[in-house]
Amino acid sequence: MARFIILFLLLAPVYSRLCLRNHPDTTWIGDSRSDQSRVNQQSLDLVTNFKGILQAKNGNGLMKQMSGRFPSDWYQPTTKYRILYIGTNDCTEGPNDVIIPTSMTLDNVARDLYLGACRGDVRVTPTFVGAAELGLIGRTDALTEFSVKVLTFNNPTIVVVGLNGMSGIYKVCIAASSGNVGGVNLVNGCGYFSAPLRFDNFKGQIYVSDTFEVRGTKNKCVILRSSSNAPLCTHIKRNIELDEYVDTPNTGGVYPSDGFDSLHGSASIRTFLTEALTCPGVDWDRIDAASCEYDSCPKLVKEFDQTGLGNTDTQIMRELEAQKEMIGKLGRNITDVNNRVDAIPPQLSNIFISMGVAGFGIALFLAGWKACVWIAAFMYKSRGRNPPANLSVA
């Protein structure tokens, strides 16, 4: 039996396959080249027979849109399962954008925005901004319902952005001649914040974006990333908390630089996605947003990184080595079990022998005791005496 199992494992097909959820309750969110929320006909052809909802709502990328304006209805799908495509337009922010004191890191911004948009319910709301010129005690101008505009302050001003208890992320950019945050002098640039921010002695211009708020992370989602290296989307790729993702292949050319609407121009990606959306035999009632199948055994996409695996031959060799290692462990386990089974008869024999010796000894003791009783009773009778009751012979 063990040999049959090993032979079966050796002959079993070794392959890997990515399956994206192709189901009416799945929303595909793409990366378009502009703020226009659209998926053109070529893109529809790309995902042939896609049964879900096609929605290109992250126009220039989530982080990039914080420098413009989110569409008022940005990303409000009602489906439970989602596929979020991250293209090159999502990766254009650079480290020079994060220089305002107390700003979040790009890694943390990417994690909260993309992981939140993938799994959570998103709401875009205006960011509160309040301002009070120094010397005007008791006066505060609350600039409510204000977002994605630039204000100019010609006199030293206290500027407060955000409210206590707020949730979400907003972007601020400044061009100031004076001002500080917590005593640290300002440097012109931008930053991302998830808590209220106060500028003291501020003179110059300030830009504040909408607040991007994520509520809950209850949805199942896979993040599909471009494998293009121009530009590098390092602040997304190196974040380990974006754990359900897969890179598009770069065989036959890299992902086009102008975004989701040009995906139809890359044959390798068109083939990749078409096959990923038409995986046969996948029970989507049991498998979540995406799966990777090794020998018909579903695994999460986070265990599968096409770019990291290298070419197909290398992957097959790795899979074969893994199978051989598993077979070796199986063989060692079978040998160990056989050794234990072979060891059982001697152990049982020793037990039976010990029990036999003990039983024979007890029998001899009882026989000797009975003999002594008979001899004592006989001696009493030979002398004409009646033996004691405890020496009576039955």
UniProtKB/Swiss-Prot annotation:
Signal peptide limits: 1-16
Alphabetical list of Pfam families matching this protein: ISAV_HA
Protein purpose: Performs attachment to host receptor thereby inducing virus particle entry into target cell. Binds specifically to 5-N-acetyl-4-O-acetyl neuraminic acid on host cells, which plays a major role in cell tropism of the virus. ALso mediates de-O-acetylation of N-acetyl-4-O-acetylneuraminic acid. This receptor-destroying activity is important for virus release as it probably helps preventing self-aggregation and ensures the efficient spread of the progeny virus from cell to cell. The highly polymorphic region (HPR) modulates the virulence in host.
Protein name: Hemagglutinin-esterase
Entry annotated with the keyword Hydrolase: yes
EC number: 3.1.1.53
Reactions catalysed, as given in the entry: N-acetyl-9-O-acetylneuraminate + H2O = N-acetylneuraminate + acetate + H(+); N-acetyl-4-O-acetylneuraminate + H2O = N-acetylneuraminate + acetate + H(+)
Entry's Gene Ontology cellular component terms: host cell membrane; membrane; virion membrane
Glycosites: 333
Compartments (UniProt record): Host membrane; Virion membrane
Transmembrane residue ranges: 348-368
Single GO MF annotation: sialate 9-O-acetylesterase activity
Keyword Transmembrane listed: yes
Active site (catalytic residues): 32, 261, 264
Chain positions of motif Cell attachment site: 119-121
Topology feature Cytoplasmic, residues: 369-394
Membrane topology: Single-pass type I membrane protein
Parts of the chain on the Extracellular side: 17-347
Keywords for the protein's UniProt record, in alphabetical order: Fusion of virus membrane with host endosomal membrane, Fusion of virus membrane with host membrane, Glycoprotein, Host membrane, Host-virus interaction, Hydrolase, Membrane, Signal, Transmembrane, Transmembrane helix, Viral attachment to host cell, Viral penetration into host cytoplasm, Virion, Virus entry into host cell
Alphabetical GO biological process terms: fusion of virus membrane with host endosome membrane; symbiont entry into host cell; virion attachment to host cell
Region of interest: Highly polymorphic region: 335-358
Origin species: Infectious salmon anemia virus (isolate Atlantic salmon/Norway/810/9/99) (ISAV)
